[in-house]
Amino acid sequence: MQLISASEGDTPCCHRPPPPALLKGIEEFNQHAYFECHETLEELWNQERVGRRRHQQSPHRSSLASGCDNLYKGILQVGVGCYHLLRRNYHGATVKLQSGADYLEPFAPVCMKVQVAHLIADARLLRAELVALGPDHFTEVDLALLPQVRLAGSTQEE
């Protein structure tokens, strides 16, 4: 089965503006406040899942039942991977960076103005560097490789 990127209209939620909680979580992520980012995005993720479940049970549901809960979960998990790296947990860092990137794939290249493709690439680059260094030397990684979440149309855009 081939996934269609969000820019091709596969995920209707991607066309919505980013909710304030997502913007707050992104700000926390970019400030390396990964614990706070986790709390913010986990609440948003749970709200989206509950709302989608309620919507799917409604007899009047529409095709808009597709939510962005896994977008939030993907960003959250990349942040958790960074948190583990900063806490010197090799296994946690490599596993969460990979799973976060995997959750984000269906939303690339851009969803809710988040430059998802860039975040995936940055997370995978950091993970590859960690793996190359190995569990005995991963703490030598250049922390400049910590991903940043970029928004399309913002001044942080390259």
Give a label for each model feature:
Residues 90-108:
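TPR/TPR-like (Sel1-like) alpha-helical repeat modules
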Residues 17, 22, 29-30, 85:
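Hydrophobic/aromatic side-chain positions at a characteristic register within alpha-helices
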Residues 56-71, 109-131:
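TPR/TPR-like alpha-solenoid helical repeat scaffolds
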Residues 77-84, 121-140:
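Alpha-helical linker/edge segments of TPR/alpha-solenoid repeat scaffolds
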Residues 133-158:
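A hydrophobic membrane-anchoring alpha-helix module
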